[in-house]
Amino acid sequence: MQSEMNYYKFDRAEWSQFHSQNFTNVTDEELAQLRSLNDEISLDDVKMIYSPLRHLIHIRYEDYQGDMFTLSRFLGMQRNPHTPFIIGIAGSVAVGKSTTARLLQLLLSRAYPEKRVQQMTTDGFLYPNAELERRGILDRKGFPESYDMELLIHFMNNVKNASGALRAPKYSHQIYDIVPGEYELIDRPDILIVEGINVLQLPSKQPIYVSDYFDFSIYVDANPDLIEQWYLERFGILLDTAFTDPNNYYYQYAIGDRADAFAMARQVWRDVNLKNLNEYILPTKNRADIILHKTTGHEIDQVSLRKW
């Protein structure tokens, strides 16, 4: 274990010593369903990395429930049993946030079978493409100004206040836009996992931040060169699956010259995703409670735990 600034740092073997014996039974078939397009995760990852992480979240969740009870007793109020414990997961495009979110949802659902554990992404709170075009910022999609932060914060406030069943806008990577009339239903979860590149950011014009609603936060980290490789691999898979569907956003690239398509993807990575990572996403890393660092093959080789 290393101690650096405000984090304890553990390599893979060291971290696995923390309650990996509480390995939750997960099958290869379940992992295959959880994986994002070109992500990689194994049963070894579940045992060595995610089982100890699940146990840490269990401890934080128990503490949270105790804090809520203490506050309710101080105020002389009955505690709302549906005030959720919210976990935020941040990191670059293509780094594997969605896989982490889905796996944690599975593990926590197994740990708390009587609880409602849900997962959502902030992609649905991007402005629709038509609105981005109207504002002249379609080429900055994914940057802070491309999100309807007021709507997202209003949504998070309603979730935290257990305001009943709520509808989150739905985003589709196939059409590269918000899906009109379709929503994800978030219905009074006990635990909610919120995944998105922007969840730890501090927008300058907001009096309250998305992260203010989090009770635990995770940043998925990797070398930008590796993330670019994963981004391009994912782009190739999207091309392979889009060429038969004219309604798919990637169809136009799938039926054209593949070299030209990848040249475009590299430019998007350089001008949009890498710039967004360096300027707005990476600076939020040290706000997370846990940093999961990935290396070749999406293997997590280091876990950093915030000291305070």
From Swiss-Prot:
Q: Membrane-spanning regions, if any? A: none
Protein name according to UniProt: Pantothenate kinase
Q: Which Pfam families match?
A: PRK
Instruction: Give the SUPFAM superfamilies listed for this entry.
Output: P-loop containing nucleoside triphosphate hydrolases
Q: Which reactions fall under this protein's catalytic activity?
A: (R)-pantothenate + ATP = (R)-4'-phosphopantothenate + ADP + H(+)
Enzyme Commission designation: 2.7.1.33
Give the UniProt family note: Belongs to the prokaryotic pantothenate kinase family.
Q: Which residues bind ATP?
A: G91, S92, V93, A94, V95, G96, K97, S98
How would you classify this enzyme at the top EC level? Answer: transferase
Gene Ontology CC annotations of this record: cytoplasm
Major location, coarse class?
cytoplasm
Biological processes per GO annotation: coenzyme A biosynthetic process
From the Swiss-Prot or TrEMBL record, what is one GO molecular function term?
Answer: ATP binding
Instruction: List UniProt keywords, sorted A-Z.
Output: ATP-binding, Coenzyme A biosynthesis, Cytoplasm, Kinase, Nucleotide-binding, Transferase
Cite the InterPro entries for this sequence. Answer: P-loop_NTPase, PanK, PRK/URK
User: Where found?
Assistant: Cytoplasm
Q: What pathway does this protein act in?
A: Cofactor biosynthesis; coenzyme A biosynthesis; CoA from (R)-pantothenate: step 1/5
Q: Which CDD domains match?
A: PanK (cd02025)
